[in-house]
Regions:
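A short, exposed loop/beta-hairpin motif centered on an aromatic-Gly-Thr core
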Residues: 19-33
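Short N-terminal binding/cap micro-motifs at the start of the first secondary-structure element
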Residues: 12-17
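Secondary-structure boundary/capping motif
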Residues: 2, 25-27, 74-75
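Short amphipathic, charge-patterned alpha-helical segments
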Residues: 35-42
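Residue-level detector of intrinsically disordered/flexible regions characterized by low predicted structural confidence
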Residues: 4, 22, 70-72
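Short, mixed-charge low-complexity intrinsically disordered segments
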Residues: 44-82
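A short beta-strand micro-motif
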Residues: 3-10
C-alpha cells in the first residue's frame, strides 16, 4: 500500500481541529501489518524526529494522523494513494 505524507497546519475552533493548509513532504509504501510504525519510520527517514511520549498515531480508518498527545493537534497525515 502506498501513502502520501503531508505536514498539517491546523487550527482549533473550540470543538475540533480543522485543517487549514497541508504541504506534501513525501510518500512511502509498505506491505507491513504495522502501518503506524512504517509511517513513523518514513517520517524519520525525512528527518522528522519526535520526543518519546509527545505524539500519538491515530488511525481513523481513512488516513493516519500523528497528533500532539496533549492537545490533539494534527501534525502529519498519511493518506492512502491506492
Amino acid at each position: 500500500m502506498k501513502f502520501e505524507i503531508r505536514q498539517i497546519d491546523a487550527w482549533f475552533d473550540g470543538e475540533a481541529w480543522t485543517y487549514n493548509e497541508s504541504f506534501r513532504i513525501g510518500e512511502f509504501s509498505t506491505r507491513a501489518e504495522n502501518v503506524k510504525r512504517a509511517f513513523c519510520r518514513a517520517l524519520h527517514g525525512l528527518g522528522v524526529v519526535f520526543y518519546r511520549g509527545r505524539v500519538v498515531v491515530v488511525d481513523d480508518g481513512d488516513c493516519l494522523e500523528i497528533q500532539n498527545r496533549k492537545s490533539g493537534e494534527p501534525l502529519f497525515v498519511a493518506i492512502p494513494m491506492d
